[in-house]
A protein has these predicted regions:
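Bacterial N-terminal signal peptides that target proteins for export
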Residues: 1-9
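N-terminal export/targeting and maturation segments
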Residues: 25-111
Length: 204
C-alpha cells in the first residue's frame, strides 16, 4: 500500500514538473489591461500570451492561430480568437505637421475579441486607453481575402486579410471603392456592413 501511494505521489510530481517545464502559454483577456497601461507594455504582454498580434499591419505573433480559428469556423466549430493591433507613427511616412500633432498619442493598441457561436460572429474592440469597447457588433460571415499589392511601388508584395461582413461574396476591390467613396460612411456602402479584423501585409 505504501509503495503504491509513493508511486502515485511520484507520478503526480512528474506530471506537475512536466507542466511547469513545458510552460503552457499564459492567457490574458482584454479587460486585464487597465486604461493607463502603456501600449508598449500591453504589446509585450500579448506577444507572450495567446493573442494574434499585428504591428503596423504586419503580423508578428499568432498567425497560425488566426488561420486555425478561421478553418475551425468554416467547419462550424465554435471558438474564440483575440487580436491585438498595434500602431506606431513613422515621421518618415507622414507630414511634419501631422507628426507634430499626433506623436504624443502613439503608439496605440486596439484589443479585439472575436467569437463564433456556430452561426454568427461577435466582435468587440477596445482602444486600450478607453474603458468601454468602441465596437461591438455581430456579423454572419468571416471572409478571407488574399491578393497581390495593387501597385508596383507598394510597401508590400501581397496581403492576407480577414473581414467580417454581411455579404459572403465581398471582395477587397469593393471595400477599397467603399473606403474612398464620399457617398456613404466607411463600412456602410452598398456592399453592406463590413469590419476588417486582421491585416497582414507580406513582403518588401
Amino acid at each position: 500500500m505504501k509503495k503504491r501511494l509513493a508511486g502515485l505521489v511520484l507520478l503526480v510530481c512528474v506530471f506537475t514538473l512536466l507542466g511547469v517545464a513545458c510552460g503552457s502559454t499564459q492567457s490574458t483577456e482584454a479587460d486585464d489591461f487597465a486604461v493607463d497601461t502603456p501600449a508598449a507594455e500591453i504589446l509585450a504582454a500579448v506577444k507572450a500570451s495567446d493573442w494574434v498580434v499585428i504591428e503596423d499591419s504586419r503580423v508578428s505573433s499568432g498567425e497560425a492561430r488566426m488561420h486555425a480559428f478561421y478553418d475551425a469556423c468554416m467547419r462550424g466549430e465554435v471558438g474564440k480568437v483575440k487580436i491585438a493591433t498595434y500602431y506606431t507613427l513613422d515621421a518618415d511616412r507622414v507630414s511634419a505637421e501631422l507628426y507634430a500633432q499626433e506623436k504624443d498619442s502613439y503608439p496605440r493598441i486596439f484589443l479585439t475579441e472575436l467569437t463564433f457561436d456556430g452561426t454568427e460572429y461577435h466582435v468587440s474592440t477596445r482602444y486600450s486607453i478607453e474603458a468601454e469597447p468602441e465596437t461591438v457588433a455581430t456579423y454572419p460571415y468571416l471572409v478571407r481575402m488574399q491578393g497581390e499589392a495593387p501597385t508596383a511601388d507598394a510597401l508590400y508584395d501581397r496581403y492576407d486579410r480577414y473581414v467580417l461582413a454581411d455579404n459572403a461574396a465581398l471582395t477587397m476591390a469593393e471595400i477599397e471603392r467603399a473606403m474612398f467613396s464620399s457617398v456613404a460612411p466607411l463600412g456602410e456602402h452598398k456592399i453592406g456592413r463590413w469590419h476588417m479584423v486582421y491585416t497582414n501585409l507580406i513582403g518588401n
